[in-house]
């Protein structure tokens, strides 16, 4: 009887120790050379899963503001200083785990601009009851938002336009924090998957607008692959626009 009693006590203690503890993790998305990604570009889908089994433990949306421009872009942060505040975009994940687990934090978006979709992920150990709050886990997402379109005029003139921004929606302007002269913007003209021309798109302002033109006389269907490239960071954004050169009547 005495032995049985202590076996029961041990089992109860083991059961208590195995009870899952709810743990909170703040997850955020940050654009390259820019600010946080959130509501202004349609939000970012966040998925928290076990890195070994793929079990999804929580998922939701990163929404909120892009953060304080002065803190993020103008004044160098000192060690330990927060990058975020209560308005900065983030997703507060809640996971129930009963032992330390290696989790994967996966981001997909921005959902307001399908052509700019990116996916990024990072893994981190999480210990039951040990929250990861404040700035939380910040994941950098590459890319720009590039929205391109074309217009075909008489004589085979093709006008190419694009409106571009940082992935967080931050503006590209002539004299602002993200200056148009720092980016290469071009359109690669393709037909049947072959490059036939390359057109430089010049900044026309006031915010994020670029345009260029070319002339194509051969009737057929074409594709303009428009890209914006930052040589300093290696960051790239792309969009595509189809157009047709009609046969002469």
Question: Where on the chain are the PLM-derived regions?
Answer:
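Surface-exposed loop/edge segments in extracytoplasmic proteins
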Residues: 52-60, 191-200, 235-236
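Sec/Tat signal peptide C-region and signal peptidase I cleavage site
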Residues: 14-20
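Short acidic/polar inter-strand loop motif in beta-rich domains
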Residues: 97-118, 229-238
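Short amphipathic, basic-aromatic surface patches that mediate peripheral association
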Residues: 28-38, 163-178
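Aromatic sugar-binding surface patches on proteins
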Residues: 67-91, 204-211
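Short coil-to-beta strand junction motifs in C2/discoidin
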Residues: 38-45, 175-185
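Surface-exposed, short loops/turns at beta-strand junctions within beta-sandwich domains
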Residues: 96-99, 215-220
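Short, compositionally biased P/S/T/A/G/V-rich stretches that sit at domain boundaries
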Residues: 125-170, 248-249
């Amino acid at each position: 009887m005495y032995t049985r009693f202590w076996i029961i006590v041990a089992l109860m203690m083991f059961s208590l120790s195995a009870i899952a503890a709810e743990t909170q993790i703040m997850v955020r998305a940050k654009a390259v050379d820019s600010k946080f990604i959130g509501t202004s570009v349609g939000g970012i889908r966040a998925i928290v899963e076990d890195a070994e089994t793929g079990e999804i433990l929580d998922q939701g949306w990163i929404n909120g503001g892009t953060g304080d421009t002065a803190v993020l872009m103008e004044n160098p942060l000192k060690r330990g200083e927060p990058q975020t505040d209560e308005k900065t975009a983030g997703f507060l994940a809640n996971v129930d785990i009963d032992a330390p687990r290696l989790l994967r934090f996966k981001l997909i978006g921005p959902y307001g601009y399908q052509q700019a979709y990116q996916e990024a992920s990072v893994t981190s150990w999480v210990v039951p009851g040990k929250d990861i709050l404040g700035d939380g886990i910040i994941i950098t997402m590459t890319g720009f938002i590039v929205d391109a379109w074309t217009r075909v005029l008489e004589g085979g003139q093709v006008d190419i336009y694009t409106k571009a921004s940082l992935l967080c929606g931050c503006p590209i302007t002539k004299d602002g924090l993200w200056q148009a002269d720092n980016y290469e913007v071009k359109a690669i003209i393709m037909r049947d998957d072959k490059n036939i021309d390359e057109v430089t798109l010049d900044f026309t302002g006031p915010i994020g607008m670029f345009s260029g033109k070319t002339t194509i006389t051969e009737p057929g269907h074409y594709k303009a692959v428009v890209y914006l490239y930052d040589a300093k960071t290696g960051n790239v954004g792309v969009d595509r626009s189809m157009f047709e050169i009609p046969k002469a009547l």
